[in-house]
Amino acid sequence: MNALALNALLPTPSQQFLLFDVDDTFTQHAQLDAQALDALWRWRESGRHAIAVTGRPAGWCDHFARMWPVDGVIGENGAFWFRYDRAARRMARRHLGQPAPGPELGVRLKQAQDCILAEFPQARLSADQAYRLYDLAIDFCEDVEGLTLADAHQIAHRLRQLGMTAKVSSIHVNAWFGEHDKCTTSRHYLQECHGLTVAQLDHSVVYVGDSPNDEPMFQAFPLSVGVANVKPHLPHMRHPPRFLTTSAEAKGFVELVNHLLA
């Protein structure tokens, strides 16, 4: 299925929930973008809801939930969600990843790490691995050079051979033990925290992302949007986004928000 231009997505009052990937969707050239942050504030000030859905680690997600204008954060590709109540000054944390963090999981992740780094010596352990609870993040282009997108998919394939779920993002290959993903936990969050029914999800939620680890979301939500830099990944996707922005990265995020608020 070929993606449609963004103007084919008709804004409606029922579109109350914007779920968005972070790296290379909400960021521009690996940094927070002032226009994207302004767009997120405008979305929230319109009375609507925003939830970040990211592969980034628990330590970062605590910060996102506290400091950003979002209702909640789904992190480590669906291992958990965090939701900060500013009035009560309390963080709600729900962990859905299995197995639970601990020494046994740490040993299994280290074994997978050692295998990948031995077989793909140009790859590196992600710099944010120390802040993760559930998954292994292999850096193929954030802080390293010399690896291609094809290499990233080879790494993901090898991790699957080791019995892990593996997804390629725009910067990392993330792998974990268990069946959760961005979609399963997004549905759980929306149903538990906002009371949405399965039927309501289809017309209430807009999702925007940029890479193969967003594919479960692109498949699940009819109102799925890819920022323009998703295009190199489309040949690797069985379930592409339904709509595409003309701009890449954060500029595409701004384009989407402006379109929905028009």
Per-segment meaning from a language model:
Residues 8-9, 13, 33, 183-262:
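Mg2+-dependent phosphoryl-transfer enzymes with acidic/Ser/Thr/Gly-rich catalytic loops
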Residues 32-128:
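Active-site phosphate-binding/coordination module
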